[in-house]
Amino acid sequence: MSRAPPTRQVDIDGVVSRLGALFSEGKQDAALGEVRALLTLLLNDNQRLTLDLARVLRRHLQQTSEKISPAQLALLLDRVDVKPPAPPPPAPSVAEVNGALSAPELPVRKGHGRRTLPAHLPRIVKRHEVPAAERDCPCCGEERKLIGYEISETLDFVPASLRVISHEREKLACRTCDEGGIAVAPPAAKLLERGLFEAGFIAQVLVAKYQDHLPLHRQRAIFGREGVELASSTLSDIVGAAHEALEPLAKRIHDHPLAAHVLQVDDTGIKVLDKDSAAGAVRGHLWAMLGDQRWASFSYSPTWEAKWPFALLSTRRGWMQADAYAGFDAIYRLGNAVEVGCWAHARRGLFECVEAGDARAAVALDFIQRVYAVEAEASVEGLNPEQRCKRREERSRPLLDSLRAWLIQQHGQAPPKSPFGRAVGYCIRQWEALLRFLTDGRLPIDNTACERALRPIAIGRKNYLFAGSETGARRAATIYSILGTAALARLEPWAYLRDVLQSLIDGWPQRRIDELLPPAWALAHSTR
């Protein structure tokens, strides 16, 4: 959230004196004009503060959802004079599509009844025998025979454990002449020259830090409870060595989003310690690039200047979905990347207005909810890109044409610096980009998939608070790229990283590095 301007100070006595002077001079119109101007300024301040308060409360209460119930929407629409047009042919209700996004289809959630435990988990059978007093038939006295078992399952947890791998290198000597010297088997390859750590241990450190958001000092304490004392610098060296080994893999991942049919881009800030900074730290940025929702690449920049995304994205040709960050404009002006707007960003400003009590924004939200309903319906029906594009043209375009007419009407009435005026202005300025999803059925309606890719970074940031250096931030970008792409391929992160690290330690040829990329690895292991 941007820093709010200071609260406006009003000299009430001065205002009264000024108005009194104008009235005494017979300048009633001028006095009324000044009153109107002052009230407009104060109203804008009030709306801004109400909006800021709503944002702070949502963050404090950790309410990240932007859903609005059908009942809320109906009540808000009753408070405004302008009503949206009748809905198009039947589509899912607002309740069914509230928060419907363009993510890949996930397994359908089951109800709240007892769920079957995953089949891949190991089973330990515990037999429970009928008590001796009940083993005989109460009617005839004969012993009852076993006819089967009534089975129920409970979930147990076995704490993760460390183990020591003892490498015994064969030593051979000649017993006959005793002059041929001793032959010793070569040592096993290691990621760290003098390291004591297997690929599984290194993978655990990486997954714990970057997937489970566990800082190194907490990992050190966990290992210490097992009697293994490790210096923080040792764990840091492990991360550094893993980064060096995995960097070629991350670079190959980086190429795929740029070549994808749909490129989605977003960024988030990260605090980086800097001894040369007066504050002791600087705000760097991690840029996320999502390619066809299969590839996730992250890059670090020390500032938010436009030159950094330009260096990353200037070679892009084709669709590029992002927010309205002005730093992307130079990329679009090259004429190769085509801007695709994000309806989640457009909706967010309007939702915040409703949250702050401005009922006018509910009209626009109603239009947008209906467009999302069309998307949800297309997903449920499993439409292919061509069919989805046709459905959008038939159902969504008329809704958006009506929404644009309403936005233009409101734009002429709302103060441009008010929260509602800014939300409406954003939609109008971005309108051409916001309509692009209508032209290609493979384009998502919003950029929330990329926002989700950044979520682990936001969660991790709350735990480790900062990167220790710019080098550490770049290491994080590398590991996030690999783990993020592995997550999109639905891979278990530790198993994948352990196998890849072991392959690299064993001398995997760089010319075959693509075989270790998450989609290729998933395919190879699914056929075993």
Regions found by a protein language model. Name each.
Residues 41, 48-51, 55, 248, ...:
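Residues on one face of amphipathic alpha-helical coiled coils
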Residues 317-318, 324-327, 366-528:
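Acidic/histidine-rich catalytic cores and adjacent linkers
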Residues 134, 138, 217-315, 379-442, ...:
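Gly/Pro-rich turn-and-neighbor structural signature
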Residues 199-212:
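Short, amphipathic alpha-helical "recognition" segments used to contact nucleic acids or chromatin
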Residues 146-148, 182-185, 272-274, 297-299, ...:
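Short helix/loop capping segments that flank catalytic or ligand/cofactor-binding pockets
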